Amino acid sequence: MQIQKLNSSKLFYNKWPYKIECYILGASRLKWLGAEITKDFCLGKPTPTLWSWQSNDRLSLRDKSALLEFTTGIEPFLELKEQLQVRVEGRRYNIYCKDRTLLENIYNAVSPWVQQVSGPTTEEELSYMLDNGHKKILRDILPKDIYQYRIYFKESWKIEDRIKFLAWAIKNPNIVDISKGSKEWLEGGKRWVYNPFIYVKDAHTLTMVGLHSSGNVKRVEEFILRENLVTA
């Protein structure tokens, strides 16, 4: 299996710089029932039954053998709860961590099932990401080659005030960029949108948005070019 290595731009879940994405049938069983019960299941021993959305009991003997091997490989790391986090999405078993040595050890233990590894490629990028959390995002190029900031708005923003803000933003198309979904929410066409956002050109525009949004800015992210990392 070909492994895709990606250069991440920010911390995962505002905490973890590294991510290992694995694909394994039975991932949900391992997540919800733990390593010991999963190994018993793979060996044909009686085990608790999960809801259908949590697991698939119809694994072939080959699938069970693979799950047993994967579980045995990842089990020693599951005790390191302060050093890593596991999230399961269907058959994708994702592991997040901070330490590159730990990343490499996990990779070596479960490499046959690894599809993708993401993280900073240099110590400078790692240090920068840990120091700045989710506030600054590393990029090779700016969004649409121009926008330096992404602004998220509070979902509780009143419709009448959103409409006023949108009217201002439409008059400034060269410094503000709004996605279709966020625009529909701003104009009242959608009652609720998760994390509505816009892109803005520069710090001056950021200030203007703050003035026109009536205190409804939830979060601001700044894009930093990797080539400028030393001076950022």
Q: Whereabouts are the PLM-identified features?
A:
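Structured alpha/beta or helical-core interaction and ligand-binding surfaces enriched in interleaved
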Residues: 1-191, 221-232
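Alpha-helical oligomerization segments
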Residues: 191-232
